[in-house]
Amino acid sequence: VKSIQRNALSAAVALAALGAAPVHAADFTIGLSNGWIGSEWRSQMIDEATAAAEAWKEQGVDVEVVVQSNNVDVPGQIAHVRNFINEGVDAIIINPNSPTAFDPVFAQAKDAGILVIATDAEVSSPDAIYVGIDQKGWAEASARWLAETLGGEGKVVAINGVAGHPANQMRVAGYQEVFGEYPGIEIVNEVNANWDQAQGQQAMQNLLATYPDLDGVWVQDGMAVGAWKSIMDESKTGDIAATGEIRKDFIDLWVENELNSGASVNPPGVMASALNVAVPLLQGRELLEPAEAGQYGNALYLDIPFIDGDNVESVAGDMDGEPGYHSYSSSMTIDQAGALFQPE
């Protein structure tokens, strides 16, 4: 990405032209947009980003966040962005409901002098950068674990998230590509369960009834708990290998039952990482390496941790005392994010 340096005067003029009242009480005001609240992961994402702003205050940089988080369609989330523009925020960090629909409104934000960062799902806009994991790589890692665990052959089903969501689309592409490298792996069915545990459990129950000789299951996020419960109900834990997830209730289930599972980690801390990249950009600092990765050439990818039988007990220990819905998480600290930039 080209050097992002703010021009306070031009931003103020642009905001005045929009009839907005710029927000300047804090050093930086950052709008956080989340367009889907169907999982605790999203709530934790917002909480961790808010905590990241507080950490900046402890270092003498007053970062305030304005949160818009509710169930909205794409036009509703575009309205989030327009609201932030009118409020005169310095940056917008968004978990977008579409990869392409935000291009015009992101251009408006740029014209208003506002930095835009997408997280968790990539966007096509040349006026935004993406800070988060490679969702395709996330799926590839767990699919490769499953394929290798099965010895490169077997009947596999996939239980996916929300059809059409950009992160889900990239994940589907990821596992399909990896399984395509193994001629002995047969994907016998692919279904959607909308990242919902109950729907995942029902989907798995139906799939087991249809395919009693199933060998493997590739399943995403919170749906994994439901899928594994159906596998356990059918007493097939010794016959089936399946991907897992990162919530404490599943990690505990995994350890207690010695499940044959592996899980790529998409930490809810991705929005906190994006915020810790946003602040140096707002301060006028330049990235050591431009954000040019990904299908749109605007991504800065974070590392993807992986949990399997070798480290799951350690992860369980790290999560001791957390509620069952809490997700195993990580994020770049202020110092780690700062290391991505040219020295001051």
Which residue ranges define each predicted feature?
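Hinge/cleft segment of the Venus flytrap/periplasmic-binding protein
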Residues: 178-182, 277-344
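Extracytoplasmic "Venus flytrap"
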Residues: 29-52, 56, 66-79, 89, ...
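Hydrophobic alpha-helical segments within soluble ligand-binding/sensing domains
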Residues: 77, 131-156, 170, 199-201, ...
